[in-house]
């Protein structure tokens, strides 16, 4: 640590010290609580020291401890921490003012506490005056501060336990709500998954429906194409059929023509054959005629010889030759007539050949037309089969599509209904989730508020606990001091009791002597009137302090070996304030009234001392003398006997003059003294054991 002048840390944004007491008890641990502002990075090199108020340098510390490094916080809230100063390093008690100071590793003071002192506790500082809640009485209760603090600590602990139970209940509720939210989220995820699956199925069915629609459109288009092709083929077939019919008609006509030509050819051939046969016959006849002519020529030559002989025969032959010539002319004419017939036959043959060729061509064309027709018929049949197959498939697809469409409609309706149900369910779940999130947010807010309040209560409880520990330590120290003082007072009381017994014996002796003198001078007093009681009362009023004992204060309590002062000299004037417990009273009415008034005065002084506090009462013990002893021992019954002369001197009970509590007449003296001591002294037992 480097030496530097102290700079006053600002109260805003610096380290704040919590619940710093004005005084601390030495020889006990001192716990220092502080909070670090948000954003402060604590270090192990930071330290907290106890400085004098006037200290101007960080090296002028009395003692210091290293600061504790708390766990890192991420919520931006201040960090609470605490350190302890050991009792052996604390300053000595005195009037010097000290303060806590937080010094960082750079040697800069980041915060300082209000000033405080180290001093021993005083007994009267640990008493607390409480007023009763009900207004029925004006009694002030003087109780130990430790009892009040213990009650407050018990209440704080009970409140902390209630808050912890409430926190546990809220955490259980939050856990249940979280589990319910998780279940709802799981159900929502399942519903969303089912919805996504149904959506996928719906999309798949939509795609299938689209594909089926496209396939149906394609098949419809193909069917239209096929129907158009079929119609076209039917038109072609009809055209071909018409052409074939025309060709067949033409072929039949050609066949008829060919048949007619064939018949005509055959007729012509028969005629030609007949003509040829006739020609051959004519040629044969001509040849025969030629041969005959040759023969005739020969014969003519022979006949020339015989011409004459056969003139007539020649003439005949000439006639026959002429006739033959005419026949030959006719035959030649017929042959000439047969030439156009040959030409016509040749033309008919050529026409028949061309007709045959045309018939062959027509046969070939008819065969090709028949083949085309067969092919067309086969293609038509195949097309019809394909169309029938396509129609069957289309019908099947239409039926399947209708079934799929019905099923799809049903599934779509079911899906729409389920989607509506899922939507309603999702809306309900969303509303439930929103409500649960709102409830969880409220619960979180309330839990955060409870946590904050619990942390605050915890901090305050820790501070109160530390304060209670400190006060408990102070109370224990004070109780030890009070116990010592009580022991000293008990010793002094025993000494006072011994001294009072001696004084009582002396007073009895003096009273006996005085009563003897009073009995001797009774006649003189009767003649002199009431002057003697008046003078006696005046003497009592003039010197009441002669009956007082020397004062024993708390300042002399340390000298436990000192003995009480000895009895006064017999020659000193002694005034009896309360002679009733010493011997029977035989004095007159004036003395009784004087003794009663003085007893009432002493009783009022005693009650005032009791109400003002135990210390004053203890200080008045020596001054009250035998009267206080008689009251404390519960043997004073003179007031009762004087108040009611007709009642017996010994009542059936013993009464405490402070709290008016009655005890049996056979009660022990020590018990009554202990009861009286309870009004002025604390118990030596610890009020509670703090763990």
Curated annotation (Swiss-Prot):
Keywords: Activator, Coiled coil, Cytoplasm, Metal-binding, Nucleus, Phosphoprotein, Transcription, Transcription regulation, Wnt signaling pathway, Zinc, Zinc-finger. One of its GO terms (biological process) is positive regulation of gene expression. Residues 45-125 are annotated as: Interaction with GATA1. One of its GO terms (cellular component) is chromatin. It is found in: Cytoplasm; Nucleus. Expressed in all tissues examined except spleen, with high levels of expression in the heart and kidney. A zinc finger (UBZ1-type) spans 653-679. Pfam families: CALCOCO1, SKICH, Zn-C2H2_12. The modification Phosphoserine is found at residue 4. One of its GO terms (molecular function) is zinc ion binding. Residues 501-691 are annotated as: C-terminal AD (CTNNB1 binding site). Zn(2+) binds at residues 656, 659, 675, 679. Residues 512-605 are annotated as: Disordered. Changing residue 20 to A: Reduced binding to p300 KIX domain; severe reduction in the autonomous transactivation function. Residues 1-30 are annotated as: p300 KIX-binding. Residues 1-190 are annotated as: N-terminal AD (CTNNB1 binding site). Residues 145-205, 232-339, 417-514 form a coiled coil. Part of a calphoglin complex consisting of CALCOCO1, PPA1 and PGM. Interacts with the bHLH-PAS domains of GRIP1, AHR and ARNT. Interacts with CTNNB1 via both its N- and C-terminal regions. Interacts with EP300. Interacts with CCAR1 (via N-terminus) and GATA1. Functions as a coactivator for aryl hydrocarbon and nuclear receptors (NR). Recruited to promoters through its contact with the N-terminal basic helix-loop-helix-Per-Arnt-Sim (PAS) domain of transcription factors or coactivators, such as NCOA2. During ER-activation acts synergistically in combination with other NCOA2-binding proteins, such as EP300, CREBBP and CARM1. Involved in the transcriptional activation of target genes in the Wnt/CTNNB1 pathway. Functions as a secondary coactivator in LEF1-mediated transcriptional activation via its interaction with CTNNB1. The C-terminal activation region (AD) is used for downstream signaling. Seems to be essential for coactivator function with nuclear receptors and with the aryl hydrocarbon receptor. The N-terminal activation region (AD) is necessary and sufficient for synergistic activation of LEF1-mediated transcription by CTNNB1. Contains a EP3000 binding region which is important for synergistic cooperation. Belongs to the CALCOCO family. This is Calcium-binding and coiled-coil domain-containing protein 1. It comes from Mus musculus. The lineage of its organism: Eukaryota, Metazoa, Chordata, Craniata, Vertebrata. The gene is Calcoco1.
